[in-house]
Amino acid sequence: MFNHVTVLLKETVDGLDIKPGGTYVDCTLGGGGHSSYLLSQLTEGGRLIAFDQDEIAIQNAKEKFSSYGEQFITVKSNFRYLSEKLQELGITEVDGILFDLGVSSPQLDTPERGFSYHHDAPLDMRMDQDAPLTAYDVVNSWSYEQLVRIFFQYGEEKFSKQIARKIEAYRENKAIETTGELVELIKEGIPAPARRTGGHPAKRVFQAIRIAVNDELKVFEEALESAIEMVKPGGRVSVITFHSLEDRICKTTFKRNSTTPQLPPGLPIIPDEFKPKLKLITRKPILPSDIELEENNRARSAKLRIAEKR
């Protein structure tokens, strides 16, 4: 069962400036927290389309929101196919779109999914369990250079080379099969003083592998551009990120789409293709309140950014 504490619930949904008869998209259904609150704001003419790659999340939401009938539509798909899937439903524009980019707590708390460094489990980490690439493949098949690159780029791990060396040496004799084995190798690769600071020593490498397995950054960048195109003028996009890499993509995409490029001086009018598509609703990200942080430790790295289509 999905018992998931939703982060920045009211801020994210209220930030969409809900029109009761509008059409909205939740790109990250998960435990259905944002969807539940959003549906409660809609009248009979309104509808919500919710995306998730996880079959359990989809089935859970169908049961939970069955009373909404045709107002609630689920799509089992990666949100990288946002435009295509909406067009298949005959939808060409919407009033608002939200993304919550955190791994949902049920995925973290289900040991066999392999997302958590707190449980010993098979190395999996796939959001979509039908996808071919697993964490096992990355850890056992990717070269030393590839591992260093993802640990450094996606995990911002200072000891990327040392950890990759430990993995490379170990797998010469035996495949690395579980999260527990991987955690021990990561610990061995990090000097003892550094192991005692900055949270769990495996946190950054696990993040990096998860991002690589699910191609998360590229997928998000493409989907955010699609969302900006799909939203009507006056409609909004709300995005919750949980690490600096995602936040950087969101910030730069919103900024690029909300500023006018340098044009030759003296132009009588700005051509349409150079006019900004967006207006920033949040100049700086909205952060969880102290009360929310006390209730939900997983909210501590969350940042919310909102933009409106011009």
Curated annotation (Swiss-Prot):
The reactions it catalyses are: cytidine(1402) in 16S rRNA + S-adenosyl-L-methionine = N(4)-methylcytidine(1402) in 16S rRNA + S-adenosyl-L-homocysteine + H(+)
Top-level taxonomic group: Bacteria
GO BP of this protein: rRNA base methylation
For the keyword Lipid biosynthesis, the answer is: no
Q: Does the keyword S-adenosyl-L-methionine apply?
A: yes
Key words of the record:
Cytoplasm, Methyltransferase, rRNA processing, S-adenosyl-L-methionine, Transferase
Listed EC numbers: 2.1.1.199
Which SUPFAM superfamilies has this protein been placed in? Putative methyltransferase TM0872, insert domain, S-adenosyl-L-methionine-dependent methyltransferases
Q: Where in the cell is it found?
A: Cytoplasm
Q: Which GO-annotated molecular functions does the record name?
A: rRNA (cytosine-N4-)-methyltransferase activity
Its predominant location is: cytoplasm
Record's GO cellular component terms: cytoplasm
Residues bound to S-adenosyl-L-methionine are 32-34, 52, 79, 100, 107
User: Pfam families of this UniProt entry?
Assistant: Methyltransf_5 (PF01795)
InterPro entries assigned to the protein according to its UniProt record, in alphabetical order: RsmH, SAM-dep_MeTrfase_MraW_recog, SAM-dependent_MTases_sf
What's the family? Belongs to the methyltransferase superfamily. RsmH family.
The free-text function statement in the UniProt record for this protein reads: Specifically methylates the N4 position of cytidine in position 1402 (C1402) of 16S rRNA.
What is the recorded name of this protein? Answer: Ribosomal RNA small subunit methyltransferase H
Q: Which organism is it from?
A: Bacillus cereus (strain Q1)
Q: What is the lineage of its organism?
A: Bacteria, Bacillati, Bacillota, Bacilli, Bacillales
Name of encoding gene: rsmH
